[in-house]
Amino acid sequence: MAKPPFPHPPSMSLALLIDLDALAHNYRTLRSGLKRGTHCGAVLKANAYGMGVREVSMRLYQEGCRHFFVAHLSEAIELQCFVPKDIYIYVLNGLRKREEKVYGHYNLIPVLGNLDQIQRWNAFSKTQKECFKAALHFDTGMTRTGLPPKDVAKLELSDFSNTEILCIMSHLACAYQAPHTMNETQRDLFDKLRKRFPFALASLANSGGFFLGPKYHYDIVRAGLALTGSYAAIFQIKAPLKPVIKAYAQILQLNEVSAGDSIGYDATFIASRASRIATLGVGYADGYLRSLSNRGEVYFSGTRVPVAGRVSMDLMTIDVT
């Protein structure tokens, strides 16, 4: 594989390459594993997992994606700038106070996770004399956000007199551990709770839930990490997904060291033989974790080589002997 061209003279020593064709392949692969009528949604939190929400959302829209999920209101507003209006944008972290008018103005879908949010959203809809869309998040075991079962039992249809409940969702806590009994427990509770809203779409599966099989897919699967192609490698699952993200760093210096020489802070790496050490212009400030010191690996000319010594803020060293 040819190295990517760096600007000349180079303005930075790290380049992140996003393969949009691989992204599209992954989306099509996931969608092909769903039954007819089930939507493959895309989770584009945190700037689309760092890939760039503009380019990623536009390509996924071209591939047919119409259900998009983000974490925060600001992300939803930004996303809306890049794709046509015939989409659904869900804001997973819920409706904060005094945000109602903004959601209404941009026609965004808050994922309501407690009784106060439900009351405020319906009251706002009444004042606007409109019926705004919303999703409901039921907590079936993740215990972070969402309505606990005791609060779901309190819900009445009158609570939604001016609200269109588009989707009922929950989130699997152990989807990345396929045999875990909690997956089935959460699914059973989700089935029980959503019976009160038979007219709404249902969404339970995240990327991990997709690989649990059709019983977890329902109407919308929320694909996030799987879109990047890294899911299969991280969790050792056989899936025809392609890596989307590749990071390239420049070599700033090559050093010939002798047996017994130390490398980097705290001399945590001692060369056991005559070695060739390359210094890269990337470090933990760029997101390469300090915890990978003396543990991580990178590719050098197509070969995996070990990190040698501490990862520092903007430099790291690798053994290319």
Name these PLM-found stretches.
Residues 1-109, 164:
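A charged N-terminal "starter" segment
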